[in-house]
Amino acid sequence: MGRAKKVVLAYSGGVDTSVCIPYLKHEWGVDEVITLAADLGQGDELGPIQAKALKSGAVESLVEDATAEFVTDYAFKAIKANALYESRYPLSTALARPLIAKLLVEAAEKYGADAVAHGCTAKGNDQVRFDLGILALNPTLKVLAPAREWKMSREQTIAYGEKFGLDFPVKKSSPFSIDRNLLGRSIEAGPLEDPMTEPPEEIYLMTKAIADTPDTPEYVEIGFEKGLPVSLNGQTLDPVTLISQLNDVVGKHGVGRIDMIENRVVGIKSREIYEAPALLVLIDAHRDLESLTLTSDVTHYKKGVEETYSHLIYRGLWYSPLKESLDAFIDHTQERVNGTVRIKLFKGNANIVGRQSDYSIYSPNLATYGEDDHFDHKAAEGFIYIWGLPTRVWAEKTKG
């Protein structure tokens, strides 16, 4: 008896997911494999992927255009949360996984599948994100992960696929593992596994080398409503267009690269290279606008929420009670986060040089040192006395 009768497989067209199709059928006794490829704005033509899946033995090959949903329901939530894993990574790849899990579950329910499958290996984060996402959305579905169990090397995996007529034009000169969507690219493996090796320039596609960037700065203005980016340079844009255009202009100036050692869910450290030009600038601009419109106690408390939120996304807990509760808190804080942030782009830097909001709680008359100063200076002495009273009592008892 096979492990499942009908399986919906998350499919990218790469070596592992292509080999998963005959492996599921011939090694694990699956009767039917349906593949699902998600279009998340990665820019690839998915028609050939459909044909490849059918050639590999799938009974049906699905392509879901979920780019708009990806930006609106996933990326924009992360922007409101200023989500940066370990203070650096804007989760451009991690954010795609709960959406793909959702698409897999929906397809399984629609086509009557009793299992879903993915091609993730045992050392990566994505296996956790897919497994937990699917579990949270439909705990009755089996989750199959052939690449986690088959114990084949890369060469053996390719040889297995070739037995079933699959062709893999793998280039030995390109040993990198790359993932891309509208929000950015992630690059790992190969020579990058040596943390002292400088990444070769050719791995970057969304961001220019500093030597190739314009010699004059460029200014952009991003408009926000309730914490969401809605306009670029005064022009209201739909979410996908805004991200796409901002990627181009920011990347042109060499902004948006990350080279970091990160702590994976499974307990190992990994060297990762990311490109996420628009997402990084949007988070920075959003955080700056919050500093203008939120009270200090909310701003400081929200920082802890943001760190927890980032960890939930990274660790596969998008569909969790805590994540939903944090969303409610974050949404409430964003009611007055409206306004415009001005950014100067030049030679790899994105510097915020201005911000304005009708809901600003910055008061020039209180902040100024000029003649228009309205601050009550006499109140400072009494404030300091009360504020420092615990310190005074402690000092008198211990130093006197």
UniProtKB/Swiss-Prot annotation:
Catalytic activity field: L-citrulline + L-aspartate + ATP = 2-(N(omega)-L-arginino)succinate + AMP + diphosphate + H(+)
InterPro entries with a match to the protein in the record: Arginosuc_syn_C (IPR048268), Arginosuc_syn_N (IPR048267), Arginosuc_synth (IPR001518), Arginosuc_synth_CS (IPR018223), Arginosuc_synth_type_1_subfam (IPR023434), AS_cat/multimer_dom_body (IPR024074), Rossmann-like_a/b/a_fold (IPR014729)
List of residues binding L-aspartate: 121, 125-126
Subcellular localization, as worded in the UniProt entry: Cytoplasm
Entry annotated with the keyword Transferase: no
EC number: 6.3.4.5
Subcellular location, principal: cytoplasm
Keywords carried by this UniProt record: Amino-acid biosynthesis, Arginine biosynthesis, ATP-binding, Cytoplasm, Ligase, Nucleotide-binding
Annotated GO biological process: argininosuccinate metabolic process; L-arginine biosynthetic process; urea cycle
GO MF annotation list: argininosuccinate synthase activity; ATP binding
GO cellular component: cytoplasm
Domain of life: Bacteria
Pathway membership, UniProt: Amino-acid biosynthesis; L-arginine biosynthesis; L-arginine from L-ornithine and carbamoyl phosphate: step 2/3
Protein residues bound to ATP: 10-18, 38, 119
SUPFAM superfamilies hit by this protein: Adenine nucleotide alpha hydrolases-like (SSF52402), Argininosuccinate synthetase, C-terminal domain (SSF69864)
Recorded family membership: Belongs to the argininosuccinate synthase family. Type 1 subfamily.
Quaternary structure note: Homotetramer.
NCBIfam families: argG, PRK00509.1
Name of this chain's protein: Argininosuccinate synthase
Lineage: Bacteria, Bacillati, Cyanobacteriota, Cyanophyceae, Oscillatoriophycideae
